[in-house]
Structures are given as C-alpha cells and as structure tokens.
Amino acid sequence: MLVVLLTAALLALSSAQGTDEEVNNAETSDVPADSEQQPVDSGSDPPSADADAENVQEGESAPPANEEPPATSGSEEEQQQQEPTQAENQEPPATSGSEEEQQQQEPTQAENQEPPATSGSEEEQQQQQPTQAENQEPPATSGSEEEQQQQESTQAENQEPSDSAGEGQETQPEEGNVESPPSSPENSQEQPQQTNPEEKPPAPKTQEEPQHYRGRPPKKIFPFFIYRGRPVVVFRLEPRNPFARRF
C-alpha cells in the first residue's frame, strides 16, 4: 500500500511540474508577442491594445489558479493518506500486541503460580492427614483389642477346666494368675475389665454331664440282670418301636 501511495504521489508531482513548465513557457511566449504588438498597434488601434493587455492579464492570472490546486491538493491528499496509514501501521499493532500479550501473560501467570501452590499443598495435607491417621490409630487399637481378646480367651480356658476339676486344682491357676500380673502390665489393665457385669465368668459345670457332651442327650441306662448269659430287662420306660434302629 505504501508503495502504491508513493508512486501515485510521484506521478502527481511530476504532472504538476509538467503543467508548471508548460504554463511558464506559455507566459514567456505570450509576453514578447504582446510587447511587440503594443508599439506597432499603439498608433492605429488603442482599443485592441487594451484588449490584448486584458487577455495577457487574464492569462497571467489564470495559470496561478491552475498551478495552486494540484500542488495543494496533491500534498494534502498525500499527507491525509500517509497519516492514517502511519497510524494504522504504528499505533494498533503496538497497543493491541502489548495489551493482548499482557492479558495472556497475566492469566497464564495466575494459572501457573496460584493454583498449583494451593491445590498441591491442600491435597498433600489432606492425603497426609488420613494416611497418618490410618498409620497411627488402627494398629494401636487393633493390636490392643486382639491381645485383650486372646488373653481373655486364654484365661477363660484356664478357668473352665479348673472349675470342672475341683477345689484343689482351682487354687493353682489362681496363684499362677496372681503371680503373672506384676510381670505383665497388660494383665493388670485387663483385670478390672473382668469385673464388669456384662462379662461374667462362666458358671461351673456339673460333673453329671460328660465332657464329650455336645448336643445329643446321653444314652439312658436301663436296669437289667444277666440270666443264663443274657441280659434280662426288668422294665421298659418306653415301648419298643419295631421300626427303630437296633444298635
């Protein structure tokens, strides 16, 4: 665009210079002719001399009118065209580029700086808190609970056979249990737990029930006597079932 404008301006200037030269040549050629005609025609036709003088004045006044507009118009048009082109070429890119770059850099810097720091720290803290809670709390509670359950079961096992055995045998495990608490602090903590009303020691079993008894009632023993090598039943509590299985 600038090249086209410059070429148009040069053409306008060259045309203006050409017109100026033509006007100057015309003036130089017209003035001597008038001067030559004035002395010749001065005696014969004074009105014609006046007419020639008027024509010369008109011709002199006309060329400046023709000369001035192109020069002024060309320069003004060139200036008007160059000013907006310069403004368009210089101002908008600088302002738009700088503003766009600043606007782009500001959000990118805010995104690169602010979120990672806050999000990373918060996420790390949130992750560390549950991990610490998981690593610290459950093992302590689970270990203590398991140990307590195991010790309670062992104590219950130690107490049950002693109850079924007799009084003499009961004293021995009690003495052993009394001696063990000072050696192990865990037993001292568990003893008050046994005193709770919920966890009562099991009632002593009767000796009538055999140890192998699980769920089937014991086999009844009928009174009988042996006669000629065969057992003879005195009486039967229940009538014999013919379809019953014989043992």
Swiss-Prot record:
Sequence repeats lie at residues 67-89, 90-112, 113-135, 136-158, 159-181. The keyword Magnesium does not apply. The keyword Signal applies. InterPro entries: Pro-rich. GO terms for cellular component: extracellular region. It comes from the Eukaryota. GO terms for biological process: biomineral tissue development. Residues 39-50, 58-71, 81-93, 104-116, 126-139, 150-159, 178-196 have a biased composition (Low complexity). Submandibular gland acinar cells. Residues 197-212 have a biased composition (Basic and acidic residues). Residues 14-219 are annotated as: Disordered. Residues 67-181 are annotated as: 5 X 23 AA tandem repeats. It holds the Pfam family Pro-rich. It is found in: Secreted. Keywords: Biomineralization, Repeat, Secreted, Signal. Residues 1-18 form the signal peptide. PANTHER family: BASIC SALIVARY PROLINE-RICH PROTEIN 1-RELATED, PROLINE-RICH PROTEIN. GRP proteins have a marked affinity for hydroxyapatite. They may play a role in the formation of the protective acquired pellicle at the saliva-tooth interface. This is Submandibular gland secretory Glx-rich protein CB. It comes from Rattus norvegicus (Rat).
